[in-house]
Design a protein with these regions (language model features):
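Histidine-/acidic-rich catalytic cores in large beta-rich domains
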Residues: 1-407
Length: 407
């Protein structure tokens, strides 16, 4: 803890995954002074820790880049470390991805997952892979052609018994001309004649927007890193309602959705966004600005969305404020940003600078916690009543129960 000066009471839930192969991995809950009150040692690195309505904590195995194992789901962990359940996918062709999961309390054990299914026969002639990117993630120029293989982005609502309730796929609504930074992680190295699959969308955050008594059909706000875009999906119709993107407004969306007119943003929109959250008309995100040349500082950015005009061409996203990384670097990857009702903001500054900072409504630092040697994915602040301090202390210090090995 480097600074604690005025943060409102609350509980800070995060993962602390060791950079070194010999290090230990933990889930942890800190108080507003940055003091660890609860922790559980893990059998392996888990990310996307969040509190569910049941009082359990969900977290997912941190497979590199994106998840490819259909037999590995999101763990439901009690505070004492007991494995309560594991939420799996509905289909082996749709492995549950690690980046995010949205609870659907209206369905018993219901959830919306992200998946990166393989999709063959795609025309990638419009792609121009950036050959200046690092070799481990760079796409070979040969992937720019016809009949290629990508990983799609799928949102899948699944009931507690594993039944698919609803699904939605990126490739039905976004064209390859909209891809800004295709990467090839070679999770499937035999694809595309050895060049590996092309990750053209890369969904990395999923928020279920609970409003207007939406019941089981609530909209979703989605962040797609490789489109440099955040967008809203209308759940009842499947349509993309709007897109906030740094792409030119003249770039037509495959489904005809409007790109919001960005007002007052000196960067004209996000680059490699993450952790997009919509509350009312306020949209926030962690804008990684990664893989930029020259390097640009990561930032928290807040927009006000106005879709009141009868003409969707007049819809706007007006920047309310931004907070740039105190180090002046991009985030590389990871990163989170959460706006509280009192105007304070809690930011996890990503993989290149593992620091959590909470800012007051005027931008003053209230809390700074440095976590060297680990790569935390996200940090979320919960209200004082969401956890009991005595229970946290009483259940701390165990090793979480791991699921049995798959058959």
């Amino acid at each position: 803890m480097e600074k604690a000066d005025g943060a409102a009471p609350g509980w800070y839930l995060t993962d602390l995954n060791a950079r070194a192969a010999t290090g230990a991995d933990f889930l942890a809950i800190l108080d507003e002074r940055g003091t660890p009150v609860w922790y559980q040692r893990l059998d392996r690195a888990l990310i996307d820790a969040k509190l569910l309505s049941t009082g359990n904590i969900s977290a997912a195995e941190n497979e590199s880049r994106f998840s490819t194992k259909p037999e590995v789901g999101h763990r439901m962990i009690a505070l004492d470390g007991t494995l309560v359940d594991e939420w799996l996918t509905d289909s082996n062709d749709h492995p549950p991805d690690k980046h995010d999961i949205a609870e659907i309390p209206e369905l018993p054990d219901g959830r919306a997952i992200i998946s990166y299914p393989l999709l063959d026969g795609v025309d990638l002639s419009s792609l121009a892979p950036d050959q200046s990117l690092p070799a481990p993630i760079r796409c070979d120029g040969s992937v720019a052609g016809v009949d290629k293989t990508i990983v799609d982005g799928s949102i899948r609502e699944i009931s507690g018994d594993g039944t698919l309730v609803w699904d939605w796929n990126m490739s039905d609504y976004f064209g390859m001309e909209e891809v800004r930074i295709p990467l090839c992680f070679k999770k499937y190295p035999a694809e595309n004649s050895g060049a590996g699959e092309v990750d053209v969308f890369h969904i990395n955050s999923l928020q279920r927007v609970v409003e207007d008594d939406c019941g089981t059909e609530c909209d979703y706000v989605v962040s797609a890193r490789h489109l440099d875009a955040v967008f809203r999906v209308d759940r009842p119709t499947d349509a993309v309602e709007w897109i906030l993107s740094s792409s030119p407004e003249s770039l037509e969306n495959l489904s005809g959705a409007e790109r919001l007119n960005i007002v007052g943003d000196p960067h004209f929109g996000p680059l490699r966004p993450h952790d997009a959250i919509l509350k009312g008309d306020i949209l926030t995100m962690h804008d990684n600005r990664s893989l930029t040349n020259p390097e640009e500082a990561a930032r928290f950015v807040q927009y006000r969305i106005d879709t009141s005009s009868s003409d969707s061409a007049d819809w706007t996203a007006t920047m309310v404020r931004q907070i740039e990384s105190p180090f002046g670097f991009s985030s590389g990857a990871l990163g989170s940003a959460r706006l509280a009702d009192d105007g304070s903001v809690l930011v996890g500054w990503g993989s290149l600078q593992p620091v959590f900072v909470e800012y007051g409504s005027t931008g003053t630092e209230l809390l700074r916690i440095a976590v060297p040697g680990v790569t935390p994915y996200r940090i979320v602040k919960y209200a004082p009543d969401d956890f009991d301090a005595d229970e946290l202390r009483a259940t701390a210090g165990n090793t979480t129960q791991a699921p049995p090995p798959p058959p």
